[in-house]
Every structure is written in C-alpha cells, then in structure tokens.
Amino acid sequence: MQKITPFLLIDGRAEEAMNFYTSVFKNAKIVDVSRAGEKGPVFSATVELDGERFILLNMGPKAEFTAAVSFFINCETQAEVDDLWDKLLAGGEPLRCGWLKDKFGVHWQVIPSALGRYLRDKDPAKSQRVMGAMMQMVKIDIAALDHAYQGA
C-alpha cells in the first residue's frame, strides 16, 4: 500500500478527471469509485497512474490548484515527453520549462531524465548551457538539450 497518496479536490468534475487521467497514462486504471447514490455523480475515485495512486474528490468551485504543488513525470524518450505533454495539455495551458497546467488546473512537469543527468554534470559549462537552453523552452526538447550539452 502506498503510504502517501495525493488527494485532489476537483471542481465538480471528478468523474471527468478520473476518465481523463486514466486515458493519459498507458499504465493506468480506476481502482475505486464512490458515488452519491446508486446512479449519482462520482463523490470520490481512486486512480492508479503508472503505479502511483491518486484520490480525486468532487468539490465545489472554491478548490483551486497552484503551481506551488506539481507532479513531476520522469520521461525516458522524446516520444514519451510528446505523448504525455500533448494529452495532459488538452484544454490546459502550456507553461515554461516543461511545466503545464491541465484542464482541471493541476500542474505537471513533463521532464526527460536526460535533463537531470545533464544538469548534474561535473563540468559547469555543460550544465549551464543545458540550463540556458531549457529556460527558453516550453515543452522540453531532448535533442536541443543534447545539442546544448555537447556545446555544438
């Protein structure tokens, strides 16, 4: 059992969020759903996204997300970055440096693992070039990061 589980208050759209998030991630499933009555709207849902559980609770319009909390997705390939970025961005807002806000207001970072490796390089010139390149991006481009890392 997961010890710490993100609990998201969704503005009256928990069922939509449940279906959306389980369609975005390839390894996703609906674990549990509680409804208000037998055929009523979803009250809460537990979903599993790539092995991590999230609880979604239907809440009124007072609940808002901020960038102070985001979910970091570690991607291995550009295809994975592109796929997750495009799906999560649908109806949302692109932000800088691999961040986006989805249509529910939840903030995500769609980041290739190569970025971390490049930024931890012992050669400060390489890591600074990569940081400079990344700061100009919205969606992260691994080839452009690699180009900056190589100094080409």
What name fits each language-model region?
Residues 1-5, 66-70:
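Short, solvent-exposed beta-strand edge segments and adjacent coil->beta transition regions
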Residues 2, 51-52:
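Short, well-ordered coil/turn segments that N-cap beta-strands
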Residues 5, 44, 96-97:
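Conserved beta-strand and immediately adjacent loop positions that scaffold enzyme active sites
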Residues 8-51:
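Core segments of cupin and vicinal oxygen chelate
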Residues 9, 72-74:
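Short hydrophobic/aromatic beta-strand micro-patches
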Residues 31, 48, 55-59, 63, ...:
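Vicinal oxygen chelate
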Residues 38-41, 65, 104:
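Short acidic/glycine-enriched loop/turn segments that link adjacent beta-strands
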